[in-house]
Amino acid sequence: MTRWRVVRTSLLLALCLSLAACAGGQQTGPEVPVEVPQKVRLLAGDTKALNYTPWYIHSFALFGPSRSGIGGGGPNVMPIKANGRPSEGGGKCCTSLPAEWQPELKLTVRWLVEKKRADGKKWGYWYKAENVQIAPYSSGNTGDAWAIFLPGDRVRIMLTDGNRDGGNNPNNRPADNDPYIAQGVIDEEWNRRYPPAHD
């Protein structure tokens, strides 16, 4: 990837996230009553990623309920390694998530993936998973937030909590039947509003 392409992709992502933040306050239809989320104590920290897919992930972002203060973004991450181990995206500051696990909390996760078509050309696509639950974690010893990207356009969000034998150990690949894995779909809205670069 050329230096210009990296700069262009970074600028495009920053623009998309800025526009999405601005668009959040615009009324687009009839007024609908909204349940305001309860205020919870938040922690801020790095977000990391593991990629078990064969596709490069340019970036991703987590969105909590409106006005909750919950959300953040994550790093780019290379495709799965030839030896079957996931690639890791280093820490990116700062994501805000509840200090204590909230079972009712639902997030939206959006990510930009570079996939190859049958003709070999690379195409970027925005994906999203809605109603994503964070895997349960113990408060008091939380560490980094992790987005784990799995084959089939799936994602799992977790916080490390010091329990190396529990379900929040980034060294362990989540089981395919893990109830905290969310299915992603092509994000038609963001692909239309913020078209990714193509070869």
Region annotations inferred by a language model:
Residues 8-9, 34-37, 77-82:
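Short, intrinsically disordered, charge-biased short linear motifs at domain edges
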Residues 34-65:
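Short, surface-exposed binding/anchoring microloops in extracellular/periplasmic proteins
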Residues 18-21:
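C-terminal motif of bacterial Sec signal peptides marking the signal peptidase cleavage site
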Residues 62-117:
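Tryptophan-paired
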Residues 29-32:
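Protein maturation boundaries and topogenic segments
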Residues 1-11:
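Bacterial N-terminal signal peptides that target proteins for export
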Residues 23-26:
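Bacterial signal peptide processing site
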Residues 102-199:
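Beta-strand-rich cores of mature extracytoplasmic or soluble domains
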